[in-house]
């Protein structure tokens, strides 16, 4: 049985943005799921519009629409590249597009899947208010304006004329996105923590799609369905702060980890669920033609959805049900509500009309099941028996025209779609004499079949067949298409039920994916709290532990008795990995995932800031400037619930400037009444001087432990990095040892040790005493001695130079 190709197309996202003072309204439409998103927020600093950049990064629009009356700084922020390879086109439209009256009119007549057709205007407004804030002028203007643009650009489908005389726009859902309910991370944080990583297709011609590389999302994504992968990506893009939702996800993961067989059975079933949202969009489009592959995928998907419900109904033992009740899970009830009996009806409806194997068996395009329509069956039987019938008619015709008979290829009557029935004569065209005898023959056209030329004629018999049978193939197609259109219209009546089931399965797929990863990698359930603290026991880095044979875990404890952690230590000692693992454990906790640790208590975090030296390939700023920008946002926007990470901040400029900038940043946080949680990694050991940093109980110092049996030993190979975080400070970087580990030649490292020792003892650096250099010096001395002995007035200058340069 053929299946629809399971490919995920890049989503087309169209966005509109308007500014009203400091209040910004954003709406964007995702064509892949026919979903309209709307949000508004307050920009504290209208000079850089940081929240707009964050929304752009998350939505990844292909086009942004704005009013022609927008401020230049606002348009510049929309045009700004967020550092990724994708470039966004900003298109200015007339300001009246976003007028409140026109926008309100568009929203009132918006058709959302599941909305009753008989609702009046007041009831429509009530229905919409459950999905967005219709009382917000900014939200109404931006979403209504975007709908007008989508209609004018023919991006969305429009339905019949409504009572006002204009067409209604049809979409699947409207969703308000409140930013204050999410953990915020910008593109720099995603890059630094390697949450997403896109590997471009290696083709130089640009053929082929990019794929997810070695990233946190790539490792956690074990989803079996396209809808699950999309939803999980949105979870990673927008981690949440809702404790109730997070606990519900964690409870579900705990349950599935305790019932591995059930998890495996569900995941195997979900592999048969294709992209139903995409199929419904195709069914709803008047220009799309549904193939047998589409119907195969649709039927297999519904069958799999029904099987998921059956697994929950009969495949869950009483002990597992008791386990569910202990976790306060309502998965069985939710499955029964979402995967309703209407899906059974849709399956029986489609299977009663469509035969997905018929096209392959019959050799032509036909989908309607045999026995469904007697008239159609009769036409198809005639069409399938047409070659034998025409062969008989041809033989009878040749009896009337014996002089047309040829030995190799006798004339025959053929059927050509959209043209009709014709007499085909091979090799030579009938001459005038023959046509005078055959008065009923009328030349139509000629063509080549390989090396044989064919000539086609209308005859009285072919005209009779035209009148009797007509263009039978297209009669069949027209009749089948009418039947399938009727089937589609009935199927689409259940779109809301199908989408409800799809949304349930997508969420289930995400939970199963996270549970699978947690079970495979021995993750634990984090404890989430409203208190602003962080307590991790034996935390690990999500990706690093996959890449090494042995990973050394570390503890983290950030509370009111030390919210600023300054970590010093050698290169290669694991400081950066530690900082990132802390952030990733916090990040995964806000997705509702288990985390790589023995235990973790995580306070809700509103934002993760990263100044970690990450640089986008397309960024127009230096790494140091990017870090300065990140630190500037930390100082302005960080709250007591934020997590700020600084890795080697200050190294991109003069040492004195770097010390001053880092010291000033830490001092600012230390003097805050309620500072954020701050983790700093640095080699600027001058900061350890009391003149650089204030004495504060909020600051704690840590270092990465190093084992060196004899501190006086000159053998650098005896140093062992333990990758263990311990309280304390260190002034040593062990840079020479790191150079050896990195493969720097040993003679270079030894010379570096001599230079370093001379520098520390304030002595002159001894000149290199290599054999090659010594022989060169001796040759130069000999040349000088010979020149001193030469009597220029009497000597042979030519012989002198020849002697020097040959020697």
From Swiss-Prot:
Known function: Involved in meiotic recombination in association with MSH4. Required for reciprocal recombination and proper segregation of homologous chromosomes at meiosis. Promotes homologous recombination through facilitating chiasma formation during prophase I. Involved in the control of class I crossovers formation.
Organism, as annotated: Arabidopsis thaliana
Tissue-level expression: Specifically expressed in flowers.
Gene deletion effect: Normal vegetative growth but severe reduction in fertility due to a decrease in chiasma frequency at metaphase I of meiosis.
Leader sequence residues: none
Similarity field: Belongs to the DNA mismatch repair MutS family.
Record keyword Phosphoprotein present: no
The encoding gene: MSH5
Tagged with keyword Transport: no
GO cellular component: a single term: cytosol
Key words, A-Z: ATP-binding, Chromosome, DNA-binding, Meiosis, Nucleotide-binding, Nucleus
GO molecular function, one term: ATP binding
Cross-referenced CDD domains: ABC_MSH5_euk
BP terms from Gene Ontology: chiasma assembly; homologous chromosome segregation; meiotic mismatch repair involved in reciprocal meiotic recombination; reciprocal meiotic recombination
Protein name: DNA mismatch repair protein MSH5
Pfam families, alphabetized: MutS_III (PF05192), MutS_V (PF00488)
Binding site for ATP: 569-576
Protein's cellular compartments: Nucleus; Chromosome
